Amino acid sequence: MWLDSSLQTWGPLVEVAEKQGQMLAIENVFEETPDTLLLLLSSFESPYFRFCFDTGHHNVFGKVPLSVWLEALAKYLAEVHLHDNHGEADEHLPVGEGKFDFTQFFALLSERKLSPIYTIEPHEEEHLWRGLEAVRKYLR
């Protein structure tokens, strides 16, 4: 039932994206595992329908290791939303100021030779500058 509804919702959007040469990326929000997103993405197998991994959402809601997520969805990864939290709420803290393991995350991306678009998601201006500084050390 969920998949049928999702296919009906996303199908027309994917068609438009393909015609216009624009990419759509679906983000993990409340998903505990990558299974539902993998099912949806693999149903289309479109180069214009991809995955956006949100580090903060994974830290709050993810129930399987980061490596499992990236193993399952690496071929679909187009973008990453970078922010941190303490695992209890979607705090949108700067990278490295919560409990998400960014060292492991960037190592996994490097091992798989993945180079997604990175978006820093601060909710305060000061967090932007601290976040940029923190991310620089991982992208050198």
Regions found by a protein language model. Give the residues of each.
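Histidine-acidic metal/acid-base catalytic patches
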Residues: 19, 34-53, 58-140
